[in-house]
UniProtKB/Swiss-Prot annotation:
Zn(2+) binds at C39, H64, E150. Keywords: Metal-binding, NAD, Oxidoreductase, Zinc. GO terms for molecular function: D-xylulose reductase activity; zinc ion binding. Its EC number is 1.1.1.9. It is an enzyme of class 1 (oxidoreductase). Belongs to the zinc-containing alcohol dehydrogenase family. It comes from Rhizobium meliloti (strain 1021). Its cofactor is Zn(2+). SMART domains: PKS_ER. Binds 1 zinc ion per subunit. This is Putative D-xylulose reductase. SUPFAM superfamilies: GroES-like, NAD(P)-binding Rossmann-fold domains. It comes from the Bacteria. The lineage of its organism: Bacteria, Pseudomonadati, Pseudomonadota, Alphaproteobacteria, Hyphomicrobiales.
Length: 346
């Protein structure tokens, strides 16, 4: 038994003891959790009780963005040792599956992902996890930054899928946490400038403080107009759709240059219209993103090198004993909040 933040059912959280796995296989590690980020999917399970086909039918521990310390290693683990500071990739695929063998383990149908029913998450003091999906953090990278690797990895995956070339002009629709991570990954990946569009000025103020980022408030100016003015009527080389909003998705052909690339990162709640002819008329290349695969090392190196600074995106750090309040704050969706983190007792 261990104390954990448990989603009992839709709209009901509790901090209580719950049975958790403690047995170590030869390829596992036991990790003492130190910092956990609150993700939009965690909040959605809290408020709606489900995401698509994944329904909370029994109590589930929340949390999947985490960093911590190795407490024990399995007998076959060689790249980690007790005391190592680590972050964890929360999806555990079947390594013998066809998807995994193709290197796209993120779309393995049998993947078990933290805090996705019926799999428990990591908002509990200790977790057992495969060493293969546990990554050492450099000494100067904090636990808070380590817990940001998971959402940043989505941005890195998007940047890689985009096939950015040095000097490209990027555009990001949506200034939520993933939109911001994607914009920073696109800059690190070679974009000379990235335009970020959103309705919420406080969010734009946060991401706009970064060098190389320009913001567009869509309440004040159409994104297509702003990008046309900035690119001599040409359009962005790469457009990342991170909002999941139907109007933004429908407008995509008007934002990209002829022969450009559109990367679909945001996930609409319901099916949305898509301008296929508009895409065809410009021969736009369309890429999609689902989580990430084989990018954690890259994400950690970008943070460790100082190339990407995610610390300004951490809006609040709240103690584990107040984690229900942390989730209630996340539900509020305060205009200036980007990432709320929960700090576990050492």
């Amino acid at each position: 038994m261990a104390k954990a933040l448990v989603l009992e059912k839709k709209g009901q959280l509790s901090l209580r003891d719950i049975p958790v796995r403690r047995d170590l296989s030869p390829t596992d590690v036991l990790i003492g959790i130190r910092t956990v980020g609150v993700c939009g999917s965690d909040v959605h399970y809290y408020t709606h009780g489900k995401i698509g086909p994944f329904v909370v039918n029994e109590p589930m521990i929340l949390g999947h963005e985490a960093a911590g310390v190795v407490l024990e290693v399995g007998s076959q683990v060689r790249h980690l040792k007790k005391g190592d500071r680590v972050c964890m990739e929360p999806g555990i695929p079947d390594l013998s599956s066809r998807s995994s063998k193709l290197g796209i383990y993120n779309v393995d149908p049998s993947v078990r992902f933290w805090a996705t029913p019926p799999v428990h998450g990591c908002l509990t003091p200790e977790v057992v996890h495969p060493a293969a999906f546990t990554y050492r953090l450099p000494d100067h990278v904090s636990f808070a930054e380590g817990a940001m690797v998971e959402p940043f990895a989505i941005g890195v995956q998007a940047a890689l899928r985009a096939g950015i070339r040095p000097g490209d002009v990027g555009a990001v629709m949506g200034a939520g946490p993933i939109g911001m991570m994607t914009a920073l990954a696109a800059l690190a990946g070679g974009c000379s400038k990235v335009y970020v569009a959103d309705l919420a000025q406080p969010k734009l103020d946060v991401i706009g403080a970064y060098e190389g980022i320009e913001t567009i408030n869509v309440r004040q100016q159409a994104v297509s107009e702003a990008l046309a003015g900035a690119t001599g009527g040409w359009g962005a080389d790469v457009v990342f759709e991170c909002s999941g909003a139907a109007p933004a998705i429908l407008a995509l052909p008007s934002l990209a240059r002829p022969g450009g690339t559109v990367v679909l990162v945001g996930m609409p709640v319901e099916p949305v219209p898509f301008d296929i002819v508009g895409m065809q008329a410009k021969e736009l290349r369309i890429e999609t993103v689902f989580r990430y695969a084989n990018v954690y090392d890259r994400a950690i190196e970008l943070i460790a090198s100082g190339k990407v600074d995610l610390k300004p995106l951490i809006s609040a750090t709240i103690p584990f004993d107040e984690s229900i309040a942390a989730f209630d704050r996340a539900v509020e969706a305060r205009p200036t909040d980007v990432k709320i983190q929960i700090e576990m007792p050492a």
